[in-house]
Amino acid sequence: MAARSSTILSELPTGHEFSPPPFDLTREYLAAYASATRDTSAVYNEAGLAPPLAVAARALGALLDVVGLPPGSLHTGQEIEMRAGVPASAKLTLSGRVAQRSKRAGMIIAVLQFDVTANDAAEPVLMGRTTVIMPQEQESQA
């Protein structure tokens, strides 16, 4: 597992862009995903494709390698749009940004917008939005 980043999502402004290094979607990862979700369908395996939510989960995992979440964070929403099938052994690239950020009642609400491309294609195979609510850091009283 890669070391977690010291960059914390709650500290990033609207418009901040991130692009983790490319990452592989492996058959081993897909088998672990199928086991964890208890997905016994062979349809994706027979077609040589990855399940859409496996692609999204792998992409968000790569994002968490470069952007950390403070303790007490809640993942409150997820939207994904698959634009194309993803080969089971694809090299994926994620690019994203903080699309919205607001503060309310001591909490920070951040919406991350991201695109995932496969095998250096020009067009994304997946587009998504993730909403996270995090506690606002308390200023130290010195």
Map each language-model feature to its residues.
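A structural connector/turn signal
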Residues: 81-83
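Hot-dog-fold acyl-thioester-processing enzymes
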Residues: 1-77, 139-142
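HotDog/MaoC-like acyl-thioester-processing domains
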Residues: 1-9, 85-142
